[in-house]
């Protein structure tokens, strides 16, 4: 099982969880340093619809990220609230799409 980032992260993208991950499995559409340069007052607008994601294939379930998340967005997959179950698939799809983008074109 892996950890999942859910709705409280959307448009927040707080990166406090990133440096505590021992396997570097937390990523997003923007790099953590890019996010940190966005002024706090502009984040909701500039990060609308964006969030961070945990790679379910790399996560070692140590829980370090869950304890560090200031918005309470990270859950053990088995403890994900019912209203946020869709985020399990959203997290996995982010990494599937990313792998497809990086795969060399077949000829």
Curated annotation (Swiss-Prot):
Entry-linked Gene3D superfamilies: 3.30.70.20
Biological function: Ferredoxins are iron-sulfur proteins that transfer electrons in a wide variety of metabolic reactions. Fdx2 can receive electrons from both FdR_A and FdR_B ferredoxin reductases, with a preference for FdR_B compared with FdR_A, and transfer the electrons to the cytochrome P450 CYP260A1.
Keyword annotations of the record: 4Fe-4S, Electron transport, Iron, Iron-sulfur, Metal-binding, Transport
Residues the record lists as binding [4Fe-4S] cluster 2: 21, 59, 62, 65
GO molecular function, one term: electron transfer activity
Cofactor: record remark: Binds 2 [4Fe-4S] clusters.
Cofactor(s), by name: [4Fe-4S] cluster
Residues the record lists as binding [4Fe-4S] cluster 1: 9, 13, 17, 69
Pfam families xref list: Fer4
Protein name in UniProt: Ferredoxin Fdx8
Listed InterPro entries: 4Fe4S_Fe-S-bd (IPR017896), 4Fe4S_Fe_S_CS (IPR017900), 7Fe_ferredoxin (IPR000813), RnfB_subfamily (IPR050294)
Domain of life assignment: Bacteria
Residues annotated as domain 4Fe-4S ferredoxin-type: 1-31, 50-79
